[in-house]
Amino acid sequence: MASIRLLPSCIVLMFLARSSLCYFITIDAHGEECFHDKVTSGTKMGLIFEVAEGGFLDIDVKIIGPDQKVIYSGERETSGKYTFAAHMDGTYNYCFSNKMSTMTPKVLKFSMDIGEAPKDTSKEDNAGHDKLSEMVSQLSEAMTGVKHEQEYMEVRERIHRSINDNTNSRVVWWSFFESLVLVAMTLGQVYYLKRFFEVRRVV
């Protein structure tokens, strides 16, 4: 009966065990956008990002801890995943920089997954409940990972579709340009031959 009574709370825990939201942002040329989350020491954090539109689809990324220590830094990255455990209590900042771009804004999709804060297991008086909560938390983490994979597959599909559309558009315009050149050359040759025979007739 205890397991049955715990089931509703476990279902709620499965959806609340991890804090995770996805965002689309636009970063102007020479611009930088920073975000922050306040967590306790030992909390697992995972940054996932992908450039959806703009230029060469690259961005500079940096994660900075509360002590101003650089935890992760990457330059001209198209996409990435970085997971780490908070080494101390405080506010963690993660910044996306488009300062390398001279005129092209970038559209970026990102999410920061924040796990549960570590618990003091010495104060737990119900080993079965603790084990069940841990299993539900792991399941929630796996479901969140699958969700993000699906979302970023959609972003990649959007990028590839945009590239294909641009390529097809360029092919169509190039074919149209070639047709105009061919028509112009044909008309030029006809005009030249007509003038040539008119001159010979006069002579």
Swiss-Prot record:
This is Transmembrane emp24 domain-containing protein. Disulfide bonds: none annotated. Residues 32-114 form the GOLD domain. Residues 1-22 form the signal peptide. Residues 192-203 are cytoplasmic. It is a single-pass type I membrane protein. Belongs to the EMP24/GP25L family. Keywords: Cytoplasmic vesicle, Membrane, Protein transport, Signal, Transmembrane, Transmembrane helix, Transport. Residues 23-170 are lumenal. GO terms for biological process: endoplasmic reticulum to Golgi vesicle-mediated transport; Golgi organization; intracellular protein transport.
